[in-house]
Amino acid sequence: MAPDVAWLLVLPLVFRPTLVTGITIQTAIKNFRTLHVDYPMVNYPKGFHGYCNGLMAYVRGKLQDWYCPKIHYVVHAPLEDIQKFCKYSESFCENYNEYCTLTQNSFPVTICTLVHQQAPTSCSYNSTLTNQRLYLLCSRKHDAEPIGIIGLY
């Protein structure tokens, strides 16, 4: 009976890293959908002083972080159009420890750039709307989901 009890104590230690990794990936997938895809594009009230200021207030609230990100990319296209590029990501980006890919198509993207470092409660952003290809981080090598945007091309 003692060996059975020992296995019950050891199994959570063996399986916990897998569960934590799975939860982290699921959170990254959800965050990509909610923080990097805005389709159709939302119009923020005038009090936000521009699209990026409204969006970044939302982003900081969702991340529950006072830190002002220096740059943030938002794609204005259906999620399905973006997802298909992570179905076969053959490249591994060692700097990010994730699979990555460059989209074949250009997408409408808003680049939110921090004007300058300010007090955490008063982040101010410039908006640049462009049409470019995306460098995506993907959740795995095949049949993956996008989990981040690491740049534009």
UniProtKB/Swiss-Prot annotation:
<dbReference type="Pfam" id="PF00074">
    <property type="entry name" value="RnaseA"/>
</dbReference>
<feature type="signal peptide">
    <location>
        <begin position="1"/>
        <end position="22"/>
    </location>
</feature>
<comment type="similarity">
    <text>Belongs to the pancreatic ribonuclease family.</text>
</comment>
<dbReference type="InterPro" id="IPR023412">
    <property type="entry name" value="RNaseA_domain"/>
</dbReference>
<dbReference type="GO" id="GO:0003676">
    <property type="term" value="F:nucleic acid binding"/>
</dbReference>
<keyword id="KW-0964">Secreted</keyword>
<dbReference type="InterPro" id="IPR036816">
    <property type="entry name" value="RNaseA-like_dom_sf"/>
</dbReference>
<protein>
    <recommendedName>
        <fullName>Probable inactive ribonuclease-like protein 13</fullName>
    </recommendedName>
</protein>
<dbReference type="GO" id="GO:0005576">
    <property type="term" value="C:extracellular region"/>
</dbReference>
<keyword id="KW-0732">Signal</keyword>
<comment type="function">
    <text>Does not exhibit any ribonuclease activity.</text>
</comment>
<dbReference type="InterPro" id="IPR001427">
    <property type="entry name" value="RNaseA"/>
</dbReference>
